[in-house]
Structures are given as C-alpha cells and as structure tokens.
Amino acid sequence: MLLLIPVLLILAGIVVYFVGNAIFSTEKGLQANWGISVPEGLREVEHYEESSFHGDGYRLTIYEVQADISLNGTFFDYGDMDREGLTEAQVALIENVTNQFDPKNGIAIPPREVYKRQVAKFGGILLCLYDATENKFFLYEEIL
C-alpha cells in the first residue's frame, strides 16, 4: 500500500507533463505571445526555453523549411524581410541565447548574410532570421 502512493504520484506527473506539452506547444506560444502562426511545411528542429514560472526569459526555436512550400503572406515570408546587417542589440541577443542553450543547429556568430524581421511587444523581442544557405529560420525570443 505504501508503494502505491509514490507510483500514483509518478504517473500523475507523467500525465501532467504530456498534457502540458500538448496544450503549451511551441506553435501555441508563438501565437499567444506574438500573434504568429507557423505554416504547414516548417519542421521544428530544436526548441529551448528557460524554466520560469512567469514564462519570461530567453527562447530559441529553429525551423527547417520543407520542400516546395509557399510562405507568401506569412510572417515567415523572407521576400518581405529586411536584408540589412544586424544591430549591436540583435547580435547581443543572438550571443546571449546561443551561450545559454548551445544549440546543435545554431547560427554562426556573427551570422553570414541573413534575412531578418523583428517584433517588439510588451517589452519583449522576437528576432526571426532566415538563413537561405541552411534553409532554416531561427527565432530568438526575449520575454520580459
């Protein structure tokens, strides 16, 4: 009987973990925080976020573009993105996030020529970079 209680607690924890991941997916977080929908054909390669009770801190999500998808008219339409160099603040954000999470598929610092789009909302920042050579999007978030 005493063994039953720890087993039930472990099972409850596992259920809460999987239900939480289903409810609070990366895509739902981008929609809730930034109003961005992730189109079909973008495959999440990596995702990192700081553990935080309030959801603040750094996040990094890397998406790979699958063959023959149209991104026209979406947030990820790199034809509408800026090609100018990165600002010092943007480079600092990339360095901070990269140093914190050490992603396997991270972008080179300083990044080679990339397409970029930045959104600022509620004091937070979302920096989206598209690397045409890698055919990947890198989303750097700083939630305050």
Can you name each region flagged by the protein language model?
Residues 1-19:
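Hydrophobic membrane-insertion alpha-helices, especially the h-region
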Residues 8, 41, 112-113:
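Intrinsically disordered, low-complexity segments enriched in proline/serine/threonine
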Residues 13-82:
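N-terminal export/targeting and maturation segments
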Residues 83-144:
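Extracytoplasmic electrostatic interaction patches
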